[in-house]
Amino acid sequence: MPPQQGDPAFPDRCEAPPVPPRRERGGRGGRGPGEPGGRGRAGGAEGRGVKCVLVGDGAVGKTSLVVSYTTNGYPTEYIPTAFDNFSAVVSVDGRPVRLQLCDTAGQDEFDKLRPLCYTNTDIFLLCFSVVSPSSFQNVSEKWVPEIRCHCPKAPIILVGTQSDLREDVKVLIELDKCKEKPVPEEAAKLCAEEIKAASYIECSALTQKNLKEVFDAAIVAGIQYSDTQQQPKKSKSRTPDKMKNLSKSWWKKYCCFV
């Protein structure tokens, strides 16, 4: 297989948040409704919360997506992710929404630990690399069954990562050596329909093409799902029709273990 862009761990010092990150209040399981990691979904004065979990094979670029989206930077060194959480406040129709991004490990050795991060997930970003046919194959063979086992109703957005490598000559040569080709966009769209994903989006963490669209779609789908969970017998709340820029007030990172 060709060399893959990876999921480097979020650097502790090199990528400083705009404002020093706040400490999470409370111990494990002690966060209240609306707090990242909290069990409640309701908002309150600080705004509502959306929990977004990124899953997919190792080295498909999950962490790169998060780092690029949250810092406008791109990590160059590949360090396999264990479990990391990132939290931010974003503005949706003028109202604050606390977005929790849970970056999970795709390696098989974490299969038993990974589902611990799935509790109260509002939206899954199921990632595969468009230049890794094996990671695409695992979408339906491994990841969808795992998600549906633990979160039968949570929405999924299928994300094709590393789209900037589709035309990369070195990558194409390496794929050809294995008698493989990049995953056709049409095949990915068909897969999204088959797994009943909310949508399919191709993006690049390096160039940031369609990167914001991925997380905007995740926030909208997460809010819709959260509303149905809170008010199953009432009509759905109005879907935000305009996604506003990410609030630059503060970012924070904390451990995902529960």
From Swiss-Prot:
This is Rho-related GTP-binding protein RhoU. Residues 10-27 have a biased composition (Basic and acidic residues). Ubiquitinated. 'Lys-48'-linked ubiquitination at Lys-177 and Lys-248 by the ECS(RAB40A) complex leading to its degradation. Interacts with PAK1. Interacts with PAK3. Interacts with ARHGAP30 in a GTP-independent manner. In its GTP-loaded conformation, interacts with ARHGAP31. Interacts with PTK2B/PYK2. Interacts with PAK4; the interaction is PAK4 kinase activity-independent and protects RHOU from ubiquitination. It comes from Homo sapiens. It comes from the Eukaryota. Belongs to the small GTPase superfamily. Rho family. The lineage of its organism: Eukaryota, Metazoa, Chordata, Craniata, Vertebrata. Pfam families: Ras. Changing C255S: No effect on subcellular location.
